[in-house]
């Protein structure tokens, strides 16, 4: 913890998470609110869902490409938790990232609140259960949506892989879009506790809000269990894990890596 706390690069990474999450939430939720303005009679629910899904996915892909080399571009507490459980970041870094992400989401939603104040019934993209969807069903949707996202993050940023020739940010962005295509009609699609938290704070409405923390965190943890222990198990002992969690020395953790300098993942410096 102390080694990271004293590094300028660490705090630069925290600021990057704050700024990138602010931009992500502003762009994505702004696009979701935009369809409420009357622009024509040719809109359908399907068109709206695709538009919003693409906005969320493309904004993640763009920002991941922009700040991935600085902070790793988590922009999502569930992703941060997944990488923590995968022993790729320290506990202190995870905590500071989640705080930065939540504050960024609140700032973005507050700005949107001022810009869209003329909208009637403006919920600022707050996540909630759709009519006919109970809490168990909503929780399940959030778990599955986040599981596939964190699984994609772990797989596309795995330093041991030598077969990746595409873009990790694009793949992750498409995974976010896929999650939204699945979950929008059920929960409004959270799969990102910070994004859900910002809207809940500004609207002062925390109805069913627990689902959008518990679901993504369970999904993220399950993704780590599936990838790190079933699909692509790592050879590591408790000493290695504790070392990463306390000192954040990621480069010394992966004992399976043949060439530590040829990793493909987006890692902070």
Swiss-Prot record:
Keywords for the protein's UniProt record, in alphabetical order: Blood group antigen, Cell membrane, Glycoprotein, Membrane, Phosphoprotein, Repeat, Transmembrane, Transmembrane helix, Transport
Domain of life of the organism encoding this protein: Eukaryota
Swiss-Prot/TrEMBL site (Hg(2+)-sensitive residue) positions: 189
Known outcome of mutating residue 45 to V: In Co(A-B+) antigen
Entry comment describing in which tissues the protein is expressed: Detected in erythrocytes (at protein level). Expressed in a number of tissues including erythrocytes, renal tubules, retinal pigment epithelium, heart, lung, skeletal muscle, kidney and pancreas. Weakly expressed in brain, placenta and liver.
Side Cytoplasmic, residues: 2-11, 66-68, 83-90, 154-163, 225-269
Record's catalysed reaction(s): H2O(in) = H2O(out); nitric oxide(out) = nitric oxide(in); CO2(out) = CO2(in); glycerol(in) = glycerol(out)
UniProt feature coiled coil, ranges: none
GO molecular-function terms, A-Z: ammonium channel activity; carbon dioxide transmembrane transporter activity; ephrin receptor binding; glycerol transmembrane transporter activity; hydrogen peroxide channel activity; identical protein binding; intracellularly cGMP-activated cation channel activity; nitric oxide transmembrane transporter activity
Post-translational modification Phosphoserine, affected residues: 247, 262
Record membrane topology: Multi-pass membrane protein
Motif (NPA 1): 76-78
Places the protein is found: Cell membrane
Effect of residue 189 to S: No effect on water channel activity
PROSITE patterns registered for this protein in UniProt: MIP
Record-linked SUPFAM superfamilies: Aquaporin-like
Primary location class: membrane
Pfam families: MIP (PF00230)
Transmembrane region(s): 12-29, 47-65, 91-109, 134-153, 164-181, 207-224
Effect of residue 209 to A: Decreased water channel activity
Motif placement: NPA 2: 192-194
Family: Belongs to the MIP/aquaporin (TC 1.A.8) family.
Domain notes: Aquaporins contain two tandem repeats each containing three membrane-spanning domains and a pore-forming loop with the signature motif Asn-Pro-Ala (NPA).
Subunit note: Homotetramer; each monomer provides an independent water pore. Component of the ankyrin-1 complex in the erythrocyte, composed of ANK1, RHCE, RHAG, SLC4A1, EPB42, GYPA, GYPB and AQP1. Interacts with EPHB2; involved in endolymph production in the inner ear. Identified in a complex with STOM. Interacts (via the N-terminal) with ANK1 (via ANK 1-5 repeats). Interacts (via the C-terminal) with EPB42.
Stated role: Forms a water channel that facilitates the transport of water across cell membranes, playing a crucial role in water homeostasis in various tissues. Could also be permeable to small solutes including hydrogen peroxide, glycerol and gases such as amonnia (NH3), nitric oxide (NO) and carbon dioxide (CO2). Recruited to the ankyrin-1 complex, a multiprotein complex of the erythrocyte membrane, it could be part of a CO2 metabolon, linking facilitated diffusion of CO2 across the membrane, anion exchange of Cl(-)/HCO3(-) and interconversion of dissolved CO2 and carbonic acid in the cytosol.
UniProt-recorded name of the protein: Aquaporin-1
Organism of provenance: Homo sapiens (Human)
């Amino acid at each position: 913890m102390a080694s990271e706390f004293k590094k300028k690069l660490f705090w630069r990474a925290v600021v990057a998470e704050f700024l990138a999450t602010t931009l992500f939430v502003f762009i994505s939720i702004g696009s979701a609110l935009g369809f409420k303005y009357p622009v024509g009679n040719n809109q359908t629910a399907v068109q709206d869902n695709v538009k919003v899904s693409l906005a969320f996915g493309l904004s993640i892909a763009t920002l991941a490409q922009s700040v991935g080399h600085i902070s790793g571009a988590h922009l999502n507490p569930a992703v941060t938790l997944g990488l923590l459980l995968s022993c790729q970041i320290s506990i202190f870094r995870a905590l500071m990232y989640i705080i930065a992400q939540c504050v960024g989401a609140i700032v973005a939603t507050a700005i949107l609140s001022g810009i869209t104040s003329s909208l009637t019934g403006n919920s600022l993209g707050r996540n909630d259960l759709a009519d006919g969807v109970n809490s168990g069903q909503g929780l399940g949707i959030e778990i599955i949506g986040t599981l596939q996202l964190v699984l994609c993050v772990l797989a596309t940023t795995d330093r041991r892989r030598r077969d990746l020739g595409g873009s990790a940010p694009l793949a992750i962005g498409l995974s976010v879009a896929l999650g939204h295509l699945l979950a929008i009609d059920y929960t409004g699609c959270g799969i990102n506790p910070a994004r859900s938290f910002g809207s809940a704070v500004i609207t002062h409405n925390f109805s069913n809000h627990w689902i959008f923390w518990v679901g993504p965190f369970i999904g993220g943890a399950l993704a780590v269990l599936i990838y790190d222990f079933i699909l692509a198990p790592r050879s590591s002992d408790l000493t290695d894990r504790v070392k990463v969690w306390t000192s954040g020395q990621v480069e010394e953790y992966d004992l399976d890596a043949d060439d530590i300098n040829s990793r493909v993942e987006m890692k902070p410096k």
